[in-house]
């Protein structure tokens, strides 16, 4: 099992040797260590006693240069249970003390590789039994797992919440028994009086709850002030005014339909969009701070978002139309006409993802104006000289819209998020429309950039 270690020990001639062997004979380490007397007490022992190697390089073993692995292990663990009995008269003592020096000279526990089947010294794990570490993980009130220090005491989420509710609501409890009920993980809800008293006894502080409430109130007020300062700089009233100023008069167009026109739906939509480009520039000028941007950036923003801006407008205008859209020219394009013209798929998306959603949530003009302003202030538009300024303006519109929905629709806390969810659909539909509407490159014989530049340089007409 342990191999041949005859070069470590020498024993009397004739003992255990093969026939004809007259020199010193090796002895198994297990037999040697099972005896009780020193090796040199035997009369025939003539060689030097066993000693640990002094240098690692002098040892001719493959096991980490520690000499016999049997010595290293048995010095700490004792002889193995399967040790062979030594013949009478041969007694050996335990390994000399010098062997301990060999073990202690090992640089780390990784240098000691145990024999197969024996655990490594460095892999022994001992659980921590420090009282302090246990207290931090146990609720001082009920003994459940602690989630941290709450109101001065390590406690679980249940006891933390119970104490906070008691203080904030100023609750008063009574005990049905003798005010000495057991409060533990299983029975903590049985008696609220005793549970609250134990919270106090263990050190929970009433003032800590009150201070937490005060901090929350101050933080909410601070956030409200920040939001207020944001939307005061981008008043929703001015955004609504911009929408109303360019709103086409379509009251008398309700009875008109596609049959009144000889053109196909795509041509009619193009003509309507052509007309709306003029009013779109007027609308943008009325949006707060848009005119403060450089003229080049104004052109870039309108060119990047015109399709989405127009689609949002006629989609909201069409919420009162049955299964179709109402153009700014007053024409009503029905779903069947769009399918006949080969644009049914994109037309259906406009109806289901925009018109229907706007109708379901009853989106008002102020919300529409804010969504369009968010589209207008696109900091990702290519070529902007100052994208960060545009992004700041967009964030102000976000703040204005959020404040408006909270004030106007307090019973709908998710309304702001619902409004923003229309923007990805608007972007996707806008990109798809460009495949069908080719008019955007030219306004008659005028390139769109030149047209927009001329429109933006024209003074705003206040009506």
Curated annotation (Swiss-Prot):
**Zinc finger residue ranges, NR C4-type:** 139-159, 175-194
Indicate the transmembrane segments per the record: none
From the UniProt entry, list the residue stretches annotated as the region Modulating.
1-138
Per the database record, which ranges form the NR LBD domain?
A: 231-459
Q: Where is this region: Hinge?
A: 205-230
Say yes or no: keyword Zinc present: yes
Keywords on record: Cytoplasm, DNA-binding, Metal-binding, Nucleus, Receptor, Transcription, Transcription regulation, Zinc, Zinc-finger
Residue stretches of biased makeup (Basic and acidic residues): 211-222
**Which portions of the sequence form the region Disordered?**
18-53, 211-232
> InterPro entries, per this entry?
NHR-like_dom_sf, Nuc_recep-AF1, Nucl_hrmn_rcpt_lig-bd, Nuclear_hormone_rcpt_NR2, Nuclear_hrmn_rcpt, Retinoid-X_rcpt/HNF4, Znf_hrmn_rcpt, Znf_NHR/GATA
User: Which Gene Ontology molecular-function terms are recorded?
Assistant: molecular condensate scaffold activity; nuclear steroid receptor activity; sequence-specific double-stranded DNA binding; zinc ion binding
May I ask which residue range the UniProt record assigns to the signal sequence?
Answer: none
Q: Which domain of life is it from?
A: Eukaryota
Ranges of the DNA-binding region feature: 139-204
Q: How is it modified after translation?
A: Acetylated by EP300.
Task: Output the PANTHER family linked to this UniProt entry.
Answer: NUCLEAR HORMONE RECEPTOR
| Note on domains (UniProt) | Composed of three domains: a modulating N-terminal domain, a DNA-binding domain and a C-terminal ligand-binding domain.
Q: Which family does it belong to?
A: Belongs to the nuclear hormone receptor family. NR2 subfamily.
By what name is this protein known?
Answer: Retinoic acid receptor RXR-gamma
Q: Which organism is it from?
A: Pongo abelii (Sumatran orangutan)
Q: What is the lineage of its organism?
A: Eukaryota, Metazoa, Chordata, Craniata, Vertebrata
Quote the gene name from the UniProt entry: RXRG
